[in-house]
Amino acid sequence: MANSWDQLGEIASVAQLTGIDALKLIGMIVNAANTARMHKKNCRQFAHHLKLIRNLLEQIKNSEMNQRSEILEPLQGLDDALRRSYILVKSCQEKSYLYLLAMGWNIVNQFEKAQNEIDLFLKIVPLINMADNARIRERLEAIERDQREYTLDEEDRKVQDVILKQESTREAATSVLKKTLSRSYPNMGFCEALKTEEEKLQLELQRSRARYDADQCEVIQRLIDVTQTAATVEPNLEKVLTKKEELTSSKKRDDLYDTDSSSIRADSRSTSYVSSGHELLSGRSLQHRGNWHADLLDCCSEPCLCLKTLFFPCGTLAKISTVATSRQISSTEVCKNLIVYSLILSCCCYTCCIRKKLRKTLNITGGCIDDFLSHLMCCCCALVQELREVEIHRASYGTEKSNKEMSPPTPQFMEE
């Protein structure tokens, strides 16, 4: 991947800034930093450092040193560095959000190199270092002390992990994109923002191909695939929500019909809805609310999954926790939690709490005692059951459940 920080801007763009002096360039950089959409903190830190340099340049401009050729020639190199710096800061406003996110640490390095290059030009100007003017030396010392630390925000780092990891689900990537793009494009809808991002990414892909940068082309192509996938997932999610609403209303009509035809079924269903998961229900009521599709003692039906869970339970529990808590949880984080809970001899309590959250997420009835006993009896069997349940819901939640609940009423005939 390209490391030269001046590749972020086109040579033509830098040439357009020729003729603008250092003071005006610094003012343009400060204005661009205030409107940056990405790396806001880095842009503002960089702009603050340049304000100190502007104070020094204004002091030099008002002194006799400004007329000497030995100081003017090195300052021309400073002008070139400032032009490239302007392109860098401007890119944080205009370039694709996903591109800037993926290139996060690379751009952080560009800010560090830009500041070091600008400071270097000030150090090689001999008359500045030997100046007797107290104010000039004071400003130069302030610049040397102002060592900024550039980094990637924690929130951007988490989004970067979800977007770039191959194992991230389409739904997880789409959910993260919705949240982040709404802030970057407040006046656009989600689909329109995705289209804009894809157009900008296609432009970046052309530039990377022109530089024969294979690694960067691969990253950009991955980002384009993410935008295209999110664009297809969004309409499907709306259709699923609409279908679920239709099934809910249809189910209510069937329940009313069954109430008139059978008092026994009415009592059973009313008990199922009123209890709402606060107590254990009978097996018949569980079918209306949602039961475990995978059996607790059927873990040997998938020996590979069983062995993986036995030797690496953190990986299985991480996948379950991600679904149960609706946020990305790594196996490392799960491992740390298990170690902490093991120290107080309550590891089983931690895993059964995850099982409880999973039941609520998948709308499965049960109780805390059942959860605790399942993990106390065989934690490996319980984890395998939970992961299989997650896979079953992903594959057939919409179709199997609707077909099961949409059974027609019993035919009735009028006696003559």
Curated annotation (Swiss-Prot):
One of its GO terms (biological process) is post-embryonic root development. Residues 191-219 form a coiled coil. The keyword Transmembrane helix applies. Inhibited by GdCl(3), but not by verapamil. InterPro entries: Adaptor_Cbl_N_dom_sf, MCAfunc, PLAC_motif_containing. It is a single-pass membrane protein. GO terms for cellular component: plasma membrane. Keywords: Cell membrane, Coiled coil, Membrane, Transmembrane, Transmembrane helix. GO terms for molecular function: calcium channel activity. The chain crosses the membrane at residues 338-354. The keyword Hydrolase does not apply. Calcium-permeable stretch-activated channel component. Probably involved in mechanosensing and in mechano-stimulated calcium uptake mechanism. This is Protein MID1-COMPLEMENTING ACTIVITY 2. It comes from Arabidopsis thaliana (Mouse-ear cress).
